[in-house]
């Protein structure tokens, strides 16, 4: 996993060049938006349990067969596994948002996820739906448009962070499908 700083150093080193110009400007911007980024990550991790349980509940409401005998969320053990997977995905999305880099998400969460779900017989459309619900929740928290819970954020526009976190959830959905 490379954070924004490591990425700039590695790229400059590969070119045998000093860090400068647009790379320095990008780092200045990253630092300037640091408090907003930390607030965005905090809004996700502070609401993680609710986000995951709401996403799984929404997925089940749309597909009640999941909790019927033979369904993938039938029995407490399977439901717990579903909730655990949602927590893991959300945790790695928050890591990626904190670092400003998707490599930790790709390497430690998404690599082999589809194959694992296929082997376990997990319905991909339901998993993708739960991920899309978490995406909507994360964007709402970051843009402070969640109706039930408002978070305090550093001053400024957070739409770029909302777009960034949405792209991480899109990567998860693409990896599962």
Swiss-Prot record:
Its annotated compartments are: Plastid, Chloroplast thylakoid membrane
Show the Pfam families listed in the entry: Phycobilisome
N4-methylasparagine occurs at which residues? 72
Q: Which residues of the sequence carry a binding annotation for (2R,3E)-phycoerythrobilin 1?
A: 82
The cross-references to InterPro entries, in alphabetical order and at most eight, read: Globin-like_sf, Phycobilisome_asu/bsu, Phycobilisome_asu/bsu_sf
Whether Membrane counts among this entry's keywords is yes
List positions binding phycourobilin.
50, 61
Question: How is the protein altered post-translationally, as described in the entry?
Answer: Contains two covalently linked phycoerythrobilin chromophores and one covalently linked phycourobilin chromophore.
The Swiss-Prot or TrEMBL record describes its family as follows: Belongs to the phycobiliprotein family.
Q: How does it assemble?
A: Heteromer of 6 alpha, 6 beta and one gamma chain.
Q: What does this protein do?
A: Light-harvesting photosynthetic bile pigment-protein from the phycobiliprotein complex.
Q: Could you identify this protein by its name?
A: B-phycoerythrin beta chain
Gene for this protein?
cpeB
